[in-house]
Amino acid sequence: MSGNRGVVYLGPGKVEVQNIPYPKMQDPQGRQIDHGVILRVVSTNICGSDQHMVRGRTTAPEGLVLGHEITGEVVEIGRGVETMKIGDLVSVPFNVACGHCRTCKEQHTGVCLTVNPARAGGAYGYVDMGGWVGGQAEYVLVPYADFNLLKLPNREAAMEKIRDLTCLSDILPTGYHGAVTAGVGPGSTVYIAGAGPVGLAAAASARLLGAAVVIVGDVNPTRLAHAKKQGFEIADLSKDTPLHEQIAALLGEPEVDCAVDAVGFEARGHGHSGSQQEAPATVLNSLMGITRVAGKIGIPGLYVTEDPGAVDAAAKHGALSIRFGLGWAKSHSFHTGQTPVMKYNRQLMQAIMWDRIKIADIVGVEVITLDDAPKGYGEFDAGVPKKFVIDPHNLFRAA
């Protein structure tokens, strides 16, 4: 048995690297399992969803070990595991899923029915998602390993592209899911709300799917400049020029075929004054306004049932002032919920290995040490155009 260290949430605005228990072959209720593996973590990423917790915008308990974006090397195998072996390099979908229940069999692994006693769906290191220990650590347990893990073939080639492959655990499939559920295809005009890592992953996915034009909107000028550098059109939502007018200036018409919400419940308003304050319904309402009749809206951005820091009493319980009548009148289709990573990760792995997508450059991957994780959280919260990837064992240098 080895020691272990991980990134621990200690209350709003505070995370710390601490000694934590080495993983055991047990579920969160303490029951012995034979279907799991223990990984030496090769990479684990800081996600915008983690930031929601760290900002105190969820009911996450102090002491929670963070991290749901994990790539690792198998170092221990449960007695019931059949397809994994010691030394395998694997990508871990952020969804914890059993593979046996109805929703798993229907590829809805984001809402597995058995891994979380409180509700459908499980994830590592996340509030209300089953108590599975997070992977921003040196070692982590992965249950139902035969079902959940994506083996990365050819370890040497994979390590050469590890900065890209680390995005397979969440943000690339999540962005892709947003684009797919928004109906993106060859020739589509697409608007992406949010120039953070998920928004850029959605934009890159739209391009991969054949979109003619991809517009990324945000209130953060630094992130918009990065998006522009990656070849996307941009809409500056901190300006008083309405979004539909900015789109019309680019396309010659004020609406798009497809739209993606990559922001979620901590959205800000639009315009010089509006962008200075939260307005959680802004993105959804704006997307209904600029999506054409019979268009589709993909919503991978996170919305919660409880938000202690919400701007009003209704939003504290996930109730937002949505112009649903507009969406109904325009016959919009909406798709929400946790991304079923397994539905896409194998194909996206192939796209990375064959240089069809350079996701690390697009989302601004910056590799940091485990000890630098608190600093990474601080910089990410300040809005830098980066995706922080933690390298707990300094393996990237050897790659």
From Swiss-Prot:
It comes from the Bacteria. Pfam families: ADH_N, ADH_zinc_N. InterPro entries: ADH-like_C, ADH-like_N, ADH_Zn_CS, GroES-like_sf, HCHO_DH_non_GSH, NAD(P)-bd_dom_sf. Zn(2+) 1 binds at residues 47, 68, 170. Its EC number is 1.2.1.46. Zn(2+) 2 binds at residues 98, 101, 104, 112. Keywords: Metal-binding, NAD, Oxidoreductase, Zinc. It catalyses: formaldehyde + NAD(+) + H2O = formate + NADH + 2 H(+); acetaldehyde + NAD(+) + H2O = acetate + NADH + 2 H(+). One of its GO terms (molecular function) is formaldehyde dehydrogenase (NAD+) activity. It is an enzyme of class 1 (oxidoreductase). NAD(+) binds at residues 48-49, 52, 198, 218, 223, 263, 268, 270, 300, 302, 337, 339. Binds 2 Zn(2+) ions per subunit. Its cofactor is Zn(2+). Homotetramer. Belongs to the zinc-containing alcohol dehydrogenase family. Dehydrogenase that catalyzes the NAD(+)-dependent oxidation of formaldehyde and acetaldehyde. PANTHER family: GLUTATHIONE-INDEPENDENT FORMALDEHYDE DEHYDROGENASE (PTHR42813:SF3), ZINC-TYPE ALCOHOL DEHYDROGENASE-LIKE (PTHR42813). This is Glutathione-independent formaldehyde dehydrogenase. The gene is fdhA.
